[in-house]
Amino acid sequence: MAKTKPILNVAFIGHVDAGKSTTVGRLLLDGGAIDPQLIVRLRKEAEEKGKAGFEFAYVMDGLKEERERGVTIDVAHKKFPTAKYEVTIVDCPGHRDFIKNMITGASQADAAVLVVNVDDAKSGIQPQTREHVFLIRTLGVRQLAVAVNKMDTVNFSEADYNELKKMIGDQLLKMIGFNPEQINFVPVASLHGDNVFKKSERTPWYKGPTIAEVIDGFQPPEKPTNLPLRLPIQDVYSITGVGTVPVGRVETGIIKPGDKVVFEPAGAIGEIKTVEMHHEQLPSAEPGDNIGFNVRGVGKKDIKRGDVLGHTTNPPTVATDFTAQIVVLQHPSVLTVGYTPVFHTHTAQIACTFAEIQKKLNPATGEVLEENPDFLKAGDAAIVKLIPTKPMVIESVKEIPQLGRFAIRDMGMTVAAGMAIQVTAKNK
């Protein structure tokens, strides 16, 4: 079997009107991932609805409601090949109420392409654009490129492109901690395909790469094999003649038969007998592998979903409390000390209490706006101290980022998201 190309997850972010979905649709079409007949059909459908020019976007906007409104709601995943990678595109929604999807989407991204409208040079940077870039930075995405879209509306003017490039660099990227000098800016007209997959003849002044070439230049994610073993449990089975078989995805480190392991917060200790993936035994498993494994000395009743496996020499951290940086996405009123919503981190769902609201931050820059505020509302970013109501494994993002991020849910919606910056470990 031919070795498949490495997979690279790329998030497309930016304001709702910048043309993200059209850019993605064009990449998929010119990259050979979509049947051109589909575009012809969608173009007809778009014109009938008075949305001419939306045909590429329709490829990503799979949901019917999105087509009617022309808005991307859920996180859509599509693939296309470049010279180097099999690229999975995470098309992140642009609307305020959909930032929670952005958080679940961006956390899977290895790199991001920010799509901006060249016209923003006149109207200023959209708040949503700031928020998206801040969020991907917060979520640990370090590789970024900028597609300056709708160049056809300014006759492919180099001056307009340079003006926007300077504004995005000075007023956005530098403030958030990206170095504009190290970021590729690409002038594109996604609807017509200029500089998306193919070089444009209409930008003779631009000598740089196309969007597809920029994506090829991103670095593949390093598998965190050098970090301590962490494997959140998704399910536990008891198989006759085999014994207890937990299943889950290796987040960090390496697991192999013979390893002495501990499940936290359960405290159960055992030894790995076999490791399997897709019904085949493996000599070892690494980050990204979804595995089942047989463990000696641990019964089905001893462990459950939400427990995290690690080596006995470096057990997962059980938090008595933790300090976190959060962004409040939506809440009908305000968050105050004592609020106890459910935290979703790795496979665990555990209620945690807001013990202190230490600082309110500017969500676009991270600077401190207020010490010890009385409350937080939608749109605020903050540093807070949290106390789990039950034992829970969470790691500091500095130590093991894969186990440091969480979403906060209440009333059937994601009210906030964030990451643990300091964890007080329970005494073993």
Curated annotation (Swiss-Prot):
Organism (species)? Methanococcus vannielii (strain ATCC 35089 / DSM 1224 / JCM 13029 / OCM 148 / SB)
SUPFAM superfamilies reported in the protein's UniProt record: EF-Tu/eEF-1alpha/eIF2-gamma C-terminal domain, P-loop containing nucleoside triphosphate hydrolases, Translation proteins
Q: Which family does it belong to?
A: Belongs to the TRAFAC class translation factor GTPase superfamily. Classic translation factor GTPase family. EF-Tu/EF-1A subfamily.
This enzyme's EC code(s): 3.6.5.3
Q: What is this protein called?
A: Elongation factor 1-alpha
PANTHER family (UniProt xref): TRANSLATION FACTOR
Which keywords describe this protein according to UniProt?
A: Cytoplasm, Elongation factor, GTP-binding, Hydrolase, Magnesium, Metal-binding, Nucleotide-binding, Protein biosynthesis
Where does it reside?
A: Cytoplasm
Q: Where is this region: G3?
A: 91-94
> For this UniProt entry, what is the primary localization, expressed as one broad class?
cytoplasm
Q: Where is the tr-type G domain?
A: 5-225
Function of the molecule: GTP hydrolase that promotes the GTP-dependent binding of aminoacyl-tRNA to the A-site of ribosomes during protein biosynthesis.
Asked if the keyword Lipid metabolism belongs to this entry, the reply reads no
Residues binding GTP are: 14-21, 91-95, 149-152
Q: Looking at the record, which segments are called G2?
A: 70-74
Q: Where exactly are the transmembrane stretches of this chain?
A: none
- Keyword field contains Lipoprotein: no
The UniProt annotation puts the region (G5) at 189-191
Residues at which Mg(2+) binds: S21
Q: Which GO terms describe its cellular component?
A: cytoplasm
